[in-house]
Structures are given as structure tokens and as C-alpha cells.
């Protein structure tokens, strides 16, 4: 398969993987409720693909991806679903905004922070990490040309339109004009910050890093700490998530600057997050009515699929790293040693 063909396949993989991770692996929808994929793929897949391409085409890395993921989260939750402001989203009676309620802003601090974790780290981050792990030879290269990026942007816009239309049709709630304006400004701020921060330099720190298995397990349990945050603590739950985020981002910033950090470590973070989603699904019910046995069978099926994706990505990434080290060793053997002095 040629490079262009592999790139298109990689882009399509991310396009269809993102909605699977974001909604089905999480446990929101059972396998019998697969028709929303038609409108979820442009939203999640188009968004993840556009974010990845913008980051990779500008030779930037994960800080840019995560900041664009925050902008994505605000677009979806402030405009498409309005869940940041709606006290009874889709009539679920979950009282999501009552924890850390901020009257002046009309938001719940816990739910807002939770959404700013879910989308950047999972919907966008995990999806991209897994897709790049499946195509390791092209992990840091753009997958699309100008036309492809334009198509991704159009698909993302279509996804926003149809999902927003669905929300408006099924829920009479409307956020205030001020809330929409502030949200739009925040989208611009985070999108601009994504390209104003310095691009990460190659790791030169000679310090050792934990094995990839350890970083993956750590990502799993840190993700679990976010999802199991004690919401009845209200502002204490907000502080809980902030502390978890600080530990995760600080550790990631420290270890990813080490020369021993490999793409397998990056993949392990995504794998840990994906498996956490799959396990957590058993602790929550789907957001649509369905028999319990269908919900359980769906969780099992989606978790097995996630494990299969992770296993394939690990094998492919390991093979790519091994091939790269062999090629590097071969080139060093063929190159005659240069004298230190002329």
C-alpha cells in the first residue's frame, strides 16, 4: 500500500474511531442504537481529524492537540448540546449543574471541568493516540492535503449543524446571548493559544522513564480518579479533578521530554484512557432506553473491540520502533567512523 493510500486509511480510521470512543465505548449508546453514528461521525470524527491535521501540519504536538480539544469541548457543550448551561439536559433529571453552581455564569463548576476533561483527553486525545498507534510510520506526519483538510472541516461543520438541530428540536432550553458570546470568545482564545505556545522540542533529557505498561496503567487509574470524583463534595470534587489533571499533565510534561520516551509510551496513555472508558461503561446505563442484557452485551462487545484495537496498535508500534532501531544500527555500521581531529 502506498503512502497516500495509508494516509487516507489512517484518516478514515480516526474519523470512525472517534465517535466509537466518545459515545459507544463510554457506554452512552448500545449496539442496537447505531444509527446516530451517521451524525456523530462528522462531529467527533471530523473534529478529531481536523484537530490532528492542524497540529501535525504546523509541526506541533500534543499541547496543541489538547488545547484545540478544549476549544472543541466548548463548541460541543456550549453550542451543540448546551449542556454547560442546561440544568436538565435532555430531561435526564441528573442535576449535573448543581455541583459547584456559579449563579453569575449559569454553569456548574464540576460539570464544566468534567466536560473539559472528557473531550480533550478522551474524545480527541485517546482517539488520535490510538489512530496514530495503528499507523506508526505516519504518526507525526499529516494524513491529508489541503482538499482533505477542507473536507474534514466541512464534515465537522455538518456534524455541528445536525447535532445542534437535533438538540434544539428535542429540548426547548436556550442559553442566554451573553453565555453564547463568552463561549465563542473562549473558543477563539483556546484555539489561538494552541498555536501561540512554543512547539515541543525533541526530548533531550537523559533521565529514565517508566515502562510503557506503567504509564498505561497510570493513565487508566488517573482517568478513573476523574470519573469517580465525589460529586457530592461539590467544590471539593472540582478541586479533586484539578489535582488529578495537575498530576497527569505535570508527569506527562516531565517524562515526554526525556529521550527515552517513545511512541509506545504515547500509545499507552491512549490505551489506558480507552480501557478506562470501556470498564466504566459497566457502571453507567445508556442514555437511551434498552434492556439490561443488551446494554451489558454492548459494553462487553465494545470493550473487546477496544482491547483488539489497542493490541493491534501496540504490535504495529513495536514493530515500527524495532524496524527503526535496526535501520539506525545498519546505517551506523555502514558509515565509517570519523576521526575526532583532522
Say what each PLM segment does.
Residues 60-66, 70, 75, 79-152:
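Membrane-interface helix-loop-helix junctions at boundaries between adjacent transmembrane segments
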Residues 143-152, 172-183, 200-220:
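Membrane-water interface at loop-to-transmembrane-helix junctions
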Residues 40-53:
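Central hydrophobic cores of alpha-helical transmembrane segments in multi-pass inner-membrane proteins
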Residues 200-333, 337-342:
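Extended, charged low-complexity segments
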Residues 17-24, 71-78, 153-163, 219-228, ...:
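Aromatic-anchored segments of alpha-helical transmembrane domains
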Residues 24-34, 285-291:
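Short, hydrophobic transmembrane alpha-helix segments
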Residues 1-12, 209-213:
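N-terminal membrane topogenic signal
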Residues 53-62, 135-144, 198-210, 256-264:
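Membrane-interface helix-boundary motifs at transmembrane edges
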Amino acid at each position: 500500500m502506498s503512502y497516500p493510500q495509508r494516509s487516507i486509511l489512517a484518516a478514515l480510521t480516526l474519523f470512525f474511531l472517534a465517535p466509537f470512543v466518545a459515545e459507544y465505548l463510554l457506554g452512552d449508546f448500545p449496539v442496537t442504537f447505531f444509527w446516530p453514528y451517521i451524525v456523530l461521525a462528522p462531529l467527533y470524527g471530523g473534529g478529531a481529524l481536523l484537530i490532528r491535521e492542524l497540529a501535525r501540519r504546523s509541526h506541533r504536538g500534543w499541547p496543541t492537540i489538547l488545547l484545540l480539544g478544549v476549544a472543541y469541548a466548548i463548541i460541543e457543550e456550549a453550542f451543540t448540546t448546551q449542556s454547560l448551561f442546561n440544568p436538565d439536559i435532555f430531561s435526564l433529571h441528573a442535576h449535573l449543574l448543581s455541583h459547584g453552581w456559579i449563579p453569575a455564569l449559569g454553569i456548574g463548576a464540576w460539570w464544566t471541568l468534567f466536560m473539559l476533561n472528557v473531550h480533550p483527553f478522551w474524545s480527541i486525545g485517546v482517539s488520535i493516540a490510538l489512530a496514530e498507534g495503528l499507523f506508526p510510520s505516519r504518526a507525526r506526519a499529516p494524513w491529508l492535503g489541503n482538499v482533505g483538510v477542507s473536507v474534514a472541516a466541512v464534515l465537522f461543520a455538518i456534524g455541528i449543524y445536525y447535532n445542534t438541530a437535533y438538540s434544539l428540536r428535542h429540548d426547548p432550553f436556550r442559553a442566554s446571548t451573553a453565555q453564547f458570546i463568552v463561549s465563542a470568545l473562549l473558543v477563539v482564545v483556546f484555539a489561538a493559544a494552541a498555536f501561540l505556545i512554543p512547539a515541543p522540542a525533541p526530548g533531550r533529557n537523559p533521565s529514565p522513564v517508566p515502562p510503557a505498561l506503567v504509564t498505561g496503567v497510570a493513565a487508566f487509574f488517573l482517568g478513573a480518579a476523574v470519573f469517580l470524583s465525589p460529586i457530592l463534595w461539590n467544590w471539593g470534587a472540582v478541586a479533586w479533578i484539578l489535582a488529578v489533571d495537575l498530576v497527569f499533565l505535570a508527569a506527562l510534561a516531565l517524562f515526554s521530554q526525556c529521550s527515552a520516551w517513545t511512541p509506545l509510551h504515547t500509545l499507552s496513555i491512549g490505551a489506558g484512557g480507552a480501557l478506562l472508558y470501556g470498564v466504566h461503561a459497566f457502571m453507567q446505563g445508556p442514555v437511551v432506553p434498552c434492556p439490561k442484557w443488551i446494554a451489558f452485551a454492548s459494553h462487553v462487545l465494545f470493550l473487546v473491540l477496544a482491547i483488539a484495537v489497542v493490541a493491534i496498535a501496540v504490535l504495529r508500534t513495536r514493530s515500527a520502533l524495532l524496524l527503526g532501531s535496526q535501520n539506525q544500527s545498519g546505517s551506523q555500521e555502514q558509515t565509517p567512523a570519523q576521526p575526532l581531529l583532522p
